[in-house]
A protein has these predicted regions:
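Conserved N-terminal entry element of GNAT/NAT acetyltransferase domains
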Residues: 1-24
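Acetyl-CoA-dependent GNAT
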Residues: 16, 20-27, 31-94
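Residue-level recognition of the GNAT/N-acetyltransferase active site
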Residues: 94, 99, 132
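Conserved beta-strand-loop-alpha-helix junction that forms the acyl-donor binding cleft
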Residues: 128-139, 157-160
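Conserved active-site tyrosine of GNAT-family acetyltransferases
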Residues: 142-144
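Active-site/acyl-donor-binding loops of N-acyltransferases
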Residues: 146-160
Length: 160
């Protein structure tokens, strides 16, 4: 087998079903959120309750069960910024999480690509997010190099 065929084969192995979450799977999303909180990989992350997820657009990845999710909501920009026009409708990604056993398999990228397609269908022209990850180098590589997002700003701190 040559390299390209192997890579294609690996990619096919990790194709998951991505669809809008149903009410029956909300408890599993909350379980994944609790798992994320226990990882302590983000500053100040607090696990979600089902109430936290009301009025959110949620896509989930399935491999027999829910293994990853992305959610957020549509926002309207109140004032002009350097990258967002006043009154522009955009999508704010609030969370993207992949179960640790399924990471580095392209599932997060599949979720982002699926979300982008859905947002384009709705006529939105921009999606954005903030991140509080402790592994900022890896997350910047993912969002900028793999997903094609642009860097806008950063907030840094130093405890004294």
């Amino acid at each position: 087998m040559n390299y390209h065929i192997i890579k294609l084969y690996e990619r096919l192995l990790y194709m998951v079903i991505i669809k809008e979450i149903n009410q029956f799977d909300m408890h599993r999303l909350v379980e994944l959120s609790l798992m994320w909180e226990k990882e302590d990989s983000c500053y100040g992350y607090r696990a979600n309750t089902e109430d936290d997820l009301r009025d959110r657009y949620i896509l989930a990845a399935y491999d027999d069960e829910l293994i990853a999710y992305i959610f957020g909501k549509e926002e309207i920009q109140e004032k002009q910024t350097s990258v967002i026009d006043k009154n522009m409708h955009y999508f704010e990604i609030e969370e993207l999480y992949v179960h640790p056993s399924y990471r580095s398999r392209g599932i997060g990228k599949q979720l982002m690509e699926s979300l982008e397609k859905e947002l384009k269908k709705k006529g939105l022209e921009m999606m954005m997010l903030n991140t509080a990850t402790k592994n900022w180098k890896a997350i910047m590589h993912f969002y900028i190099d793999e997903i094609g997002m642009n860097f806008w700003s950063a907030k840094l701190y130093k405890r004294l």
